[in-house]
């Protein structure tokens, strides 16, 4: 057996570092990373033993910290959570989040730090207007004006196969980061918003359906405009807290302005001669939203009665449950290969790679620094550059 290369870390820093993560117990660390046993970690935290350099680096990676942090003599200031966990307000969730979600939030916040670092000497981005009251229509109108949004759309061809990407690009063009969270159950979260004066963050769960993501995106935009950074499930439950209810209404009004929506809905009902799931799907298609979002908007704008709303909700739910296997199969596709740059942009959005690539092009950073900032192998730079810089 070779000689162990010890990392003579500060045990106090190991304890502090774990306290900054969702790992409440030693065993929970071992569950995620079996090579770091609870027994060994306990000995390291007590100072009875030391990890090897390899083990310490693995632990630093797990905790999302620089390796050098473990050698500090004093604990750094605790990182302030920048959002309100609104999932807990209905009593269904504890305040804890999974390691997968926590890890994704760290990744997205780190990406924003990189964007800010490479743009700090440039002209400040356009300020998001502050509206100091709960006027749903005024805030929705401000969102539409800020984004230059024009709905209803002429047809589904406006957004092609993916309405979420259509709206996402509009939002990102206005320097609002839109990332997607991977590996997190949809029941745990649908959306996250973190307000900053420049480059605020929106994160959407990648496991959701594309049209459902559209509503989540605008729900989180409402939080950004209200400066009410939040972690949300966005289930439009009547028992949601007041802030969630307001943001649901703002999202609906921003995506589906009342007068335009009522006109489209009534025209469709007249053309088809009935209010059914086909009619609702066509209405939803003009705005790139889910049938459930369109149905709720029909009720909110009094196009249909409360009774008809619940009747149709039952029909749509039954149709979905009856066809869920087909829907999931169609969604997953036929094992068609997806290019690396497509996966990368799907997860991280366009702002990060565009900012880093421009920093390299202007001579601010080297090629190696560019690859490290993006977290990609050099061989992927060409395809990323083509996808981002010429879009």
Question: What are the functions of these language-model segments?
Answer:
Residues 1-391:
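Active-site hotspot residues in diverse enzymes, especially metal/ion-binding acidic/histidine motifs
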């Amino acid at each position: 057996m070779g000689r162990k290369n010890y990392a003579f870390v500060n045990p106090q820093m190991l304890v502090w570092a774990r306290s900054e993560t969702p790992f409440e117990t030693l065993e929970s660390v071992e569950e995620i990373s079996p090579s770091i046993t609870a027994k060994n970690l306990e000995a390291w935290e007590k100072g009875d033993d030391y990890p090897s350099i390899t083990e310490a680096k693995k632990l630093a990676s797990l905790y999302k910290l620089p390796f050098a942090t473990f050698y500090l003599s004093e604990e750094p200031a605790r990182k302030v959570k920048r959002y309100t966990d609104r999932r807990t307000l209905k009593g269904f969730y504890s305040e804890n989040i999974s390691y997968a979600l926590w890890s994704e939030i760290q990744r997205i916040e780190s990406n924003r730090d990189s964007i800010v670092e490479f743009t700090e000497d440039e002209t400040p981005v356009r300020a998001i207007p502050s509206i100091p009251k709960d006027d749903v229509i005024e805030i929705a109108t401000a969102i539409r004006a800020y984004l230059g949004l024009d709905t209803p759309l002429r047809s589904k061809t406006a957004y092609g196969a993916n309405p979420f990407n259509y709206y996402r690009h509009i939002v990102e063009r206005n320097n609002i980061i839109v990332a997607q969270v991977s590996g997190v159950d949809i029941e745990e979260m649908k959306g996250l918003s973190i307000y900053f004066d420049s480059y605020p963050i929106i994160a959407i769960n990648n496991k959701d359906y594309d049209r459902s993501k559209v509503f989540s995106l605008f729900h989180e935009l409402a939080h950004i405009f209200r400066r009410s950074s939040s972690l949300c499930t966005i289930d439009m439950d009547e028992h949601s807290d007041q802030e969630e209810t307001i943001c649901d209404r703002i999202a609906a009004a921003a995506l589906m302005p009342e007068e335009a929506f009522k006109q489209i809905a009534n025209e469709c009902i007249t053309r088809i001669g009935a209010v059914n799931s086909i009619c609702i799907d066509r209405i939803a298609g003009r705005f790139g939203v889910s049938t459930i979002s369109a149905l709720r908007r029909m009720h909110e704008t009094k196009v249909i009665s409360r009774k008809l709303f619940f009747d149709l909700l039952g029909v749509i739910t039954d149709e979905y449950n009856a066809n869920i296997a087909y829907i999931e199969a169609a969604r997953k596709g036929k094992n068609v290969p997806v290019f690396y740059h497509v996966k990368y942009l799907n997860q991280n959005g366009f702002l990060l790679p565009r900012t880093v690539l421009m920093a390299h092009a202007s001579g601010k950073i080297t090629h190696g620094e560019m690859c490290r900032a993006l977290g990609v192998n050099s061989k992927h730079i060409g395809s990323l550059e083509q996808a981002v810089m010429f879009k």
